[in-house]
Amino acid sequence: MIETELGQLRRSHYSNDLNASMDGTQVTVMGWVLTVRGHGNISFATVRDKNGDLSIVAKKGDCPDEIREKISSLKAHSSIGVTGTIKASEKAPSGFEIIPTELRVFSEVTTIPPFEPTAKTVKNIDTRLEVRPIDLRRNILQHVFKTRSLVLKTIRDYFNDQNFVEINTPKMIATATEGGAALFPIFYYNKEAFLAQSPQLYKEQLTMSFEKVFEIAPIFRAEPSRTNRHLAEAISIDLEEAFVDYNDVMSRIEEIIKVSIIAVNDYIKNNPDSEFTPTP
């Protein structure tokens, strides 16, 4: 059966939840088509979800002909849902494959993107930005974003373990009182305002109430630059602590860097396909 609507169908497993020991188990998976190939009475498709790749094998006699024929006609990047049975297979990259019994094609590609999701590098940044969601499906960028998320979680966990209070300070301010970097002016209810370039003043005041505070949030700096690596908008990790001196703060920052490096090294160890180099 082939349908195009999600309906009541829901994913039962992600790719990393499945293994060969589940032989004979019925599952429902969803993702984007990575590759498709056919050989006579058999069609193969690799489907990628957020955690990895899945092998879909449609063989004449094992699944409905309409599903086998539809899989062979799919183009890369089409989004699909597949219900089928796990079959252990030494030939499959993950040790198993899925024999489909139901296929749903949620969206089918009509124009082939200018690069493959398996590409390690794409030189033209404009090309990448035109199809950014597809660009971000590339393995290296998946690991970059997951590592970034891990580092932010690790830092937030550290602050929580040390009894810091997380705060959220205003990002639109009435006056340019922070000094230093140039500010972005904006109109706020027909009055001039600015995007905040630092939470420093708010942090200092809040330590008089909570002693230990931190914030992970955007900052904005209107500084002209001739390099394309300069960020006018960035994520800042700020902390403030009462009753300590400069050396205490530096020790705190060193601890944050240490726990972050440990977390990243563990990630690299558990994900060798990231091709990242661990820090000694």
Feature names for model-found ranges:
Residues 1-280:
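Class II aminoacyl-tRNA synthetase catalytic cores and aaRS-like
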